[in-house]
Amino acid sequence: MAWRRVLSQVARNRSAYAICNEIIYANPSRILRGDTIAGGTLRNLHERYQSSYVGSFARRMRQMDSPSEASLLKEIYRSDPERVIQIFESQPSLHSNPSALAEYVKALVRVDRLEDSTLLKTLQRGIAASAREEENLGSVSENLGSVSAFRSAGQVTKDGILGTANAPIHMVTAETGQFKEQLWRTFRSIALTFLLISGIGALIEDRGISKGLGLNEEVQPSMESNTKFSDVKGVDEAKAELEEIVHYLRDPKRFTRLGGKLPKGVLLVGPPGTGKTMLARAIAGEAGVPFFSCSGSEFEEMFVGVGARRVRDLFAAAKKRSPCIIFMDEIDAIGGSRNPKDQQYMKMTLNQLLVELDGFKQNEGIIVIAATNFPESLDKALVRPGRFDRHIVVPNPDVEGRRQILESHMSKVLKSDDVDLMIIARGTPGFSGADLANLVNVAALKAAMDGAKAVTMNDLEYAKDRIMMGSERKSAVISDESRKLTAYHEGGHALVAIHTEGAHPVHKATIVPRGMALGMVAQLPDKDETSVSRKQMLARLDVCMGGRVAEELIFGDSEVTSGASSDFQQATAVARAMVTKYGMSKQLGFVSYNYEDDGKSMSTETRLLIEKEVKCFVENAYNNAKNILIKHNKELHALANALLEHETLTGAQIKNILAQVNNKQQQEHAIEAPQKTPAVPSSPAASAAAAAAAAAAAAQQAAAKAKGEIAGIGS
């Protein structure tokens, strides 16, 4: 019944709407259609009827929803959206159906006629006019009813389905029942995307990336080397081995005449910084041939096959410029031992290198020189005879080599007359050429910061101590008790080292914090050592125990600190090596034991015996250090006081302090000897007690005097 009432009302409004339409648009008179009072009145009447016509059913749309008609339009929409538009516009009864209206809007969107629909614009104005009329009634209930009706029937229309000029509709329809079509569409999109990316990648690989990586450009040799063998110091044996390669590059016929063949590859082996790269440049400079330089890491990129291609290009360019030298630094980056688990592209580069080393003729004039710090990691096929079949060891320089290297670097800086490079060379055992170059550079920077005119010996000593012992932390806040304990601790180390046969000479003692240590005693050998004797190892154990013994003698057993933990670790390691590696234990004999495999290679009894021997070595060292410090107690006090005052003492200053203490003791004994009167013979025990008391009094007096006179030493 409600539907019929709405239809009748719509019919009445429609008749009025038709009359207005006929009067306004069918009348040929310009008066009615122009901008006159009559024309304006008729147009207002026309708009009012339009609003009444549309607004009358907009307020009752909730009651007029016909599912059957909307379903019919929905089915027709799938195949023919134009038909949906025609049906909706030709049947006014559907205008009050929200579902039908939604299908009509969808059809307009699909055929792209949303902006051209006059009926849709009329519906929008009618809904807006209806809302305004409901608001003017003033009734809360009618307002709620109007809003509810408008929301239920026109919520989608107001908020987005009908759209506006400022907020156009964006609609995506998902059709049901077409899963296979959607799946095929998705698969087709993915396939096309993959083909597109593959094509672009191939194009970039062929044109763009290859040019960017330099694969299409011919490999060019490095700049001509001006380095000569005379510039390389400290590796005389390695230079002698490489001279024959220089002779071959200068005069190949000299060797080929007698059928001689030079190695295809030369592998330079040695620690970092020993001058392997400099030797290769010296060969190129001496022979005067093109020099191709590369690094093992330069061959690999993110693209598979780039490494092998670069190897081919490198050797192809070298063949065009033979005789020449190819130098590969850090060859272990590509020449490491092959593993079945490695990626295929990693093997391709190494395989190509192996082929190139065997691929060119032996007398072609191409010498391949490689350098590595880890020869044991190289693939066996790479170092076999016929490839890198000659290994030249480039070790750290000896004392004479270090002096030559220092002279070479010091020739480039201003130095004072007091510089003695032999002293620096003796004090830098184990330094490589790069370390010595860094030492000279640090000294030059120190002199420049101080405003000096030339580099002095003190600058070189400062640089050496900074490299070997770490930078000073003078800003660290340390209590007086801690400084005093550190002074006696380091004094104990130094004193035991001085009075123990086989110990290295004391180079410097300091209580200035360096690195993580509060103080340290540096010992340097007089010359380079190739092996260590049993006496030297036992002396090293005694020196390690000197710090803890000094703490016990001066401060008591209850005041010892954890500062000796590193000393104990070092002593234990030396003692264990003497027992398990060097065969220096009479109990275990000349047997080597692997102590680092958790005891798997030895029995429990053997392990206990090893621990017993290690403990015996350490305890003997402790007793030796204790006897030395008790005997030289005055020297310990004098040395500790000097460290507290000056913080750092050199080996020569320490010897001067000890010599002054000994001289004072001798003078005191010489003065006291004539003053003694003949004593009445007494028992041996009484004589010994009297002698001990006299010695103790003399020791206290000498210590007091030494403490007052030590201030002028070490300045």
Curated annotation (Swiss-Prot):
Residues 1-18 form a transit peptide. It comes from the Eukaryota. GO terms for biological process: protein import into chloroplast stroma; proteolysis. Its EC number is 3.4.24.-. One of its GO terms (molecular function) is metal ion binding. The active site is at residue 490. It is found in: Mitochondrion. It is an enzyme of class 3 (hydrolase). Binds 1 zinc ion per subunit. The keyword Nucleotide-binding applies. Coiled coil: none annotated. Zn(2+) binds at residues 489, 493, 567. PROSITE patterns: AAA. Keywords: ATP-binding, Hydrolase, Metal-binding, Metalloprotease, Mitochondrion, Nucleotide-binding, Protease, Transit peptide, Zinc. Its cofactor is Zn(2+). It holds the Pfam family Peptidase_M41. In the N-terminal section; belongs to the AAA ATPase family. Probable ATP-dependent zinc metallopeptidase. This is ATP-dependent zinc metalloprotease FTSH 5, mitochondrial. It comes from Oryza sativa subsp. japonica (Rice). The lineage of its organism: Eukaryota, Viridiplantae, Streptophyta, Embryophyta, Tracheophyta. The gene is FTSH5.
